[in-house]
Curated annotation (Swiss-Prot):
CDD domains: HFD_H2B (cd22910). GO terms for biological process: innate immune response. Pfam families: Histone. It comes from Caenorhabditis elegans. It comes from the Eukaryota. Residues 1-30 are annotated as: Disordered. Core component of nucleosome. Nucleosomes wrap and compact DNA into chromatin, limiting DNA accessibility to the cellular machineries which require DNA as a template. Histones thereby play a central role in transcription regulation, DNA repair, DNA replication and chromosomal stability. DNA accessibility is regulated via a complex set of post-translational modifications of histones, also called histone code, and nucleosome remodeling. InterPro entries: Histone-fold, Histone_H2A/H2B/H3, Histone_H2B, HISTONE_H2B_site. This is Probable histone H2B 4. The gene is his-48. Belongs to the histone H2B family. Keywords: Chromosome, DNA-binding, Glycoprotein, Isopeptide bond, Nucleosome core, Nucleus, Ubl conjugation. GO terms for cellular component: nucleosome; nucleus. It is found in: Nucleus; Chromosome.
Amino acid sequence: MPPKPSAKGAKKAAKTVVAKPKDGKKRRHARKESYSVYIYRVLKQVHPDTGVSSKAMSIMNSFVNDVFERIASEASRLAHYNKRSTISSREIQTAVRLILPGELAKHAVSEGTKAVTKYTSSK
């Protein structure tokens, strides 16, 4: 029997489980979305020789979802205050400044600005 290929860092985004309903046809379960692939990529950029457990990955995924939720709700509130029906990059930037502390907010704003500039120039 050949040895199993090393899946040291290969995290699956989601499992597709097949269940048989009453009508006899196979039905796939919905895929669970997560940021695990992207968290893993960042981890490998910062610490190439470090792994992460599934429990730690679940915690990181919850953390990312929580931060995005906070930014989105703050941006929504800002748009509502200013009688705007659209959340623009300006609302997101202000929300990030309000939510994240000090130096972290500065770095997040500069990285966000860089990403938006890169996106608009590639269009």
